Amino acid sequence: MSDFEPFYNVDLSYEDNYARGPFGEFAAALRGDVPAGEAASPAKSSFLGIPVDLPFGIPAGPLLNERFTTAAFRMGFDIATYKTVRSRAWGCNPFPNVLAVHPTSADGSLTPGSAELDEGVLADADYRLPISISNSFGVPSRDPDEWQPDMRRAIAAAGPGKKEYAEQNVSKEMEQTMEAQP
């Protein structure tokens, strides 16, 4: 790899990432070594009816807990999705569970109708930049007694436009999660 250090360390287990991450620039953002992403002007876009500066974010997969979402917000992402949770603790699939994905095209894209879509894409542990990954965590979850307070801290750390969406939707999502799973 290069000097670039991803915020999720693929050489560590999910549990180690949860306990020790995030890494790289995201860790620097948590320490305050990187200026917080602040809105300099009114929001320019919206996402699900909530004003945001840029409707671009990070999906739930690698944002394991409040430290990861807070770092994402501080790095300037307006949409940081907290890792999917369950109504009870659930372990992660065995390590290794992240692979680098290498489409054959020079720009890394997949073309509709290409043989690669039928035959498959090379996936291995060769993490070259630019990097694309695929994971199979298995929807792990901490016990609700742990993740619910952590999620509240994540919401509290969100800034304008980010916090409003979370406050409007998280309580409803927590209720649905608790009702949907045994």
Predicted regions span which residues?
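Active-site entrance/lid segments in N-terminal catalytic domains of soluble metabolic enzymes
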Residues: 8-9, 13-14, 18-22, 27, ...
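N-terminal basic, low-complexity leaders that serve as flexible interaction/assembly modules and, when applicable
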Residues: 1-59
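Residue-level preference for alpha-helix termini and adjacent loops
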Residues: 46-51, 55, 61, 84, ...
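Short beta->alpha connector loops
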Residues: 60-66
